[in-house]
């Protein structure tokens, strides 16, 4: 992983893939959204492409979660960190095992509302509505 980092400055963010596991830690499947080759703060218009657990920010970029968000503070945090980072580096490695059922899954509706608010704040209302229409169409035609 370290050998794949180009340049002299350390990346602002290292990110990678996520395995979904059961409560016993057994592999179930790879997360349906895979880490993109190139990631920018605008990438999250497509959804949370990288789990925050597989997203490592350089210490000088880290800031607290915005606690007004109960279920999607990680989504907002990642966007804010990516906006500040000059270089985001895909490790091309599976970095974490993630439990199949988390807080966001159990509170799905509230989480979606929060994400809509977060996306509207970072990307604008019109862009957020457009992307959500695409999400709905994609679900209908799967």
Predicted regions span which residues?
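Alpha-helical elements of Rossmann-like donor-binding domains used by nucleotide-donor carbohydrate transfer enzymes
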Residues: 1-4, 76-80, 114-118
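Catalytic core of nucleotide-sugar-dependent glycosyltransferases
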Residues: 94, 105-130
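Generic structural signal for secondary-structure transition and capping sites
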Residues: 10, 86-87, 124
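Conserved nucleotide-sugar donor-binding catalytic segment
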Residues: 16, 22, 29-110
């Amino acid at each position: 992983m370290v050998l794949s980092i180009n340049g002299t400055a350390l990346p602002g963010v290292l990110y990678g893939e996520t395995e979904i596991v059961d409560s016993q830690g057994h592999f179930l499947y790879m997360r349906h959204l895979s880490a993109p080759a190139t990631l920018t703060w605008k990438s999250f218009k497509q959804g949370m492409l990288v789990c925050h657990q597989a997203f490592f920010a350089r210490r000088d970029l880290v800031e607290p979660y915005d606690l007004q968000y109960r279920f999607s503070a990680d989504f907002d945090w990642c966007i804010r960190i990516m906006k500040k980072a000059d270089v985001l580096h895909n490790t091309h490695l599976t970095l974490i095992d993630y439990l199949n059922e988390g807080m966001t899954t159990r509170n799905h509706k509230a989480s979606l509302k929060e994400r809509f608010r977060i996306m509207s704040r970072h990307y604008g209302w019109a862009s957020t509505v457009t992307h959500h229409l695409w999400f709905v169409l994609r679900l209908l035609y799967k």
